[in-house]
């Protein structure tokens, strides 16, 4: 939504969270993913689809898939009520509608106020919560909508096999830094880069951890040997990718390190923000093949210099 453009363009490390309810429980979504909210409409079922896929509907000439979020999260549909809402989203270059029971409001908070859930609750794997946020007096579960869609439609996420389409490749020794909070996506990106010949990869769970590492080596003469290029997501607990990009590009010792923002949120508005912050390139997930091509070009350009 429009107000989010003002928030993120300066790398303030803030997020606007839209709160909604499912069976009385509070959940949240980044407002940057939300196109609009509308009353639930009649949906045409799709045969042989995932249990959580209600079907399709067509508002204003745009065909949208509807995911029943109550069904996905709890296994129970409950009674579909006339007051149910559809949250229409835009991420990963897809428009998807999610059924919810009500929308409560929007809170502006710092990413520092969002904590990653304990992995012990999910057997060391990513759950469907990307973080737990304190919004006023309430604890709000921020859902990982990319993971939800990836589980329902795996073909829409990163495909390691896309690297094979790039042809034969040489091994590359440059040190790559990756800031990505999703365990699933970190593995997919890491496997893809390894297949592409990038064998020297250091990963961090959020922008804060990546920044602390970069700060710790910023004065070393071999800085660019240890951090040749940074790939960062945008949405991360503690410090987001826009804030990380801003800090790197404002630092005299780091500013020449290429920064690629690799996020599900990339659109024209986000592209403007990233450019203002100094990002060298911005790519939308799941374009992993294009990511490798851009990495090659940026690193080759730096080697020539």
Locate the predicted segments by residue.
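Conserved acidic segment of CheY-like receiver
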Residues: 24, 172-193, 230
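Short amphipathic alpha-helix used as the core "switch/output" element in two-component signaling
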Residues: 242-255
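Acidic catalytic/metal-coordinating carboxylates
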Residues: 206, 240-243
């Amino acid at each position: 939504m429009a107000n989010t453009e003002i928030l993120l363009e300066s790398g303030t490390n803030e997020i606007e969270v839209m709160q909604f309810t499912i069976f009385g429980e509070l959940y949240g979504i980044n407002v940057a993913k939300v196109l609009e909210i509308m009353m639930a409409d009649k949906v045409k079922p799709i045969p042989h689809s995932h249990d959580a896929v209600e079907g399709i509907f067509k508002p204003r000439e745009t065909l949208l898939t509807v995911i029943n979020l109550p069904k996905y999260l709890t296994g129970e549909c409950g009674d579909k009520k006339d007051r149910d809402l559809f949250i229409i989203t835009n991420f990963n270059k897809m428009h998807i509608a999610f059924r919810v029971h009500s929308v409560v409001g929007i809170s502006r908070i710092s990413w520092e106020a969002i904590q990653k859930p304990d992995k012990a609750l999910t057997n060391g794997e990513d759950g469907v919560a990307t973080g737990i946020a304190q919004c006023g007096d309430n604890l709000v579960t921020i859902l990982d909508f990319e993971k939800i869609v990836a589980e329902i439609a795996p073909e829409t996420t990163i495909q390691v096999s896309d690297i094979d389409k790039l042809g034969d490749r040489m091994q590359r020794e440059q040190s790559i830094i990756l800031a990505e909070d999703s365990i699933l996506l970190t593995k997919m990106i890491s496997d893809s880069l390894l297949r592409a010949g990038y064998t020297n990869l250091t990963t961090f769970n959020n922008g804060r951890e990546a920044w602390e590492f970069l700060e710790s080596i910023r004065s070393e003469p071999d800085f660019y040997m240890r951090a040749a290029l940074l790939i960062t997501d945008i949405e991360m607990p503690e410090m987001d990718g826009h804030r990380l990009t801003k800090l790197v590009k404002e630092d005299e010792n780091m500013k020449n390190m290429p920064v690629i923002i690799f996020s599900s949120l990339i659109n024209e508005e986000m592209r403007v923000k990233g450019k203002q912050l100094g990002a060298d390139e911005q790519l939308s997930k799941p374009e992993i093949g294009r990511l490798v091509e851009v990495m090659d070009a940026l690193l080759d350009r730096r080697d020539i210099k």
